[in-house]
């Protein structure tokens, strides 16, 4: 067993995390502890070398991101299983033994997901996830004190901040896609594993505490937005079957454009030739597809499908990306677009420039597919709401577009 803790300038969190791992009730001669450092400048490596000599240190020359940093750690590790833990986690002594318990009855499982709670232990952080149709990952019942979904079951994906996976399989299927850098690489990995016929399992008895996004707060919000939106596109391009991708990708691109215009406060009428007909304005749309869709969810910060829950969702998503709730300020003629709006266009551009590699990855996954989209997406569910932008007019447009494009009907059986 190898446990990899990825670190980037997180010295302030390390002692709590590493001390807890050193106290694990697990045979020392069967446990390899690895700190993979992403070029930290805060003395993290020197501190761990002195304070935590049990840890093998893999020191990288620069920040390779969450995805590739963990990939390097997995390649350097020696265990049959490799675990990934965020540096702002704390685990109880029995965490690892409990996480491995499902293998007693399901020895074929490929990946094991932990139960993650808030730092004070009072609310849910991760008990399973789904996604919205545009590819943004969701955490079910986030911030709730309890949940009926908090039971052992197969998942669409494990949270990359506290999971185990068979190391050889992880490497053979490509690991975390290094092109993601960070955000949704765990969603992509879980979707890929499931498509290839491998099971991801949630074990509620294996609980860890999470300080929550200590590293992400150091990254400017417009840069985080590029990662979030671009990686969502990467995920759907690689993993949807042909029919679903043909429905979703055009809509996802149109919605990114709509969101950018709203973020920038652009008035489309200013660009319309006098006398030209204005496009129709979609009428207000219902926010949920079914009465049972009111379960809280979060986009690695989203809460909810109902209106109150959805408002909480956007506050949570804003906290994740260090950005305020949606505020639309009219753009002056000739004025520049704000970076948060431009970040969506950059996400589209980076996706376009990466299409050659994306299509090769898609071909690899689709040629090895063993399960249908309905089977896989049903493990977490698909939300129609966008977890990243709570503008009421935008959500009306999104629901209208999903309906007229046939997306709503296509995902009826798995809709949150």
PLM feature spans:
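A recurrent flexible, glycine/aromatic-enriched loop bordering the glycosyltransferase active site
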Residues: 123-126, 133-138, 144-168, 172, ...
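N-proximal low-complexity "stem/linker" segments adjacent to membrane-targeting elements
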Residues: 1-23, 29
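A short, conserved alpha-helix in the catalytic core of glycosyltransferases
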Residues: 98-99, 156-207
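Short aromatic/hydrophobic "clamp" motif used to bind/position activated sugar donors
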Residues: 82
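Glycine-rich, basic loop-to-helix element that forms the pyrophosphate-binding segment
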Residues: 59-77, 87-89, 98
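Active-site-adjacent helix/loop segment of glycosyltransferases
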Residues: 196-359
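Conserved donor NDP-sugar-binding/catalytic core segment of glycosyltransferases
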Residues: 89-132
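A conserved acidic beta->alpha catalytic loop
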Residues: 20, 27, 37-46, 62
């Amino acid at each position: 067993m190898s446990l990899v803790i990825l670190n980037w300038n997180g010295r302030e969190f390390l002692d709590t995390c590493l001390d807890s791992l050193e106290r694990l009730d697990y045979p020392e001669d069967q446990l390899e502890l690895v700190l993979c450092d992403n070029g930290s400048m805060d003395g993290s490596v020197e501190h761990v070398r002195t304070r935590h000599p049990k840890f093998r240190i893999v020191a990288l020359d620069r920040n390779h991101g969450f995805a590739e940093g963990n990939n390097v750690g997995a390649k350097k590790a020696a265990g049959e299983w490799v675990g990934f833990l965020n540096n702002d986690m704390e685990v109880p002594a029995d965490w690892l033994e409990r996480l491995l318990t499902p293998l007693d009855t399901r020895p074929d499982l490929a990946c094991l997901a932990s139960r993650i709670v808030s730092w004070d232990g009072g609310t849910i952080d991760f008990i399973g996830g789904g996604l919205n149709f545009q590819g943004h990952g969701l955490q079910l019942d986030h911030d709730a004190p309890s949940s009926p979904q908090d039971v052992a079951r197969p998942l669409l994906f494990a949270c990359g901040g506290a999971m185990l996976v068979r190391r050889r399989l992880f490497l053979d299927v490509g690991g975390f896609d290094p092109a993601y850098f960070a955000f949704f690489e765990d969603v992509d990995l879980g979707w890929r594993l499931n498509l290839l016929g491998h099971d991801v399992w949630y074990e509620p008895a294996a609980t860890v505490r999470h300080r929550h996004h200590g590293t992400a707060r150091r990254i400017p919000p417009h840069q985080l937005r590029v990662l979030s939106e671009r990686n969502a596109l990467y995920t759907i391009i690689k993993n949807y079957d042909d029919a679903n991708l043909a429905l979703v990708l055009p809509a996802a691109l149109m919605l990114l454009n709509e969101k950018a215009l709203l973020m920038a406060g652009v008035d489309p009428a200013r660009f319309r030739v006098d006398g030209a007909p204005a496009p129709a304005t979609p009428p207000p749309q219902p926010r949920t597809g079914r009465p049972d869709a009111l379960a809280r969810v979060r986009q690695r910060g989203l809460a909810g499908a109902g209106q109150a829950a959805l408002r909480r969702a956007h506050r949570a998503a804003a906290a994740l990306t260090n950005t305020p709730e949606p505020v639309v300020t009219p753009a002056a003629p000739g004025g520049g677009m704000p970076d948060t709006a431009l970040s969506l266009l950059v996400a589209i551009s980076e996706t376009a420039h990466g299409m050659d590699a994306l299509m090769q990855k898609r071909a690899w996954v689709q040629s090895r597919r063993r399960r249908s989209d309905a089977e896989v997406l049903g493990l977490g569910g698909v939300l129609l709401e966008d977890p990243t932008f709570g503008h009421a007019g935008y959500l009306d447009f999104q629901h209208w577009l999903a309906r007229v494009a046939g997306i709503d009907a296509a995902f009826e059986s798995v809709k949150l």
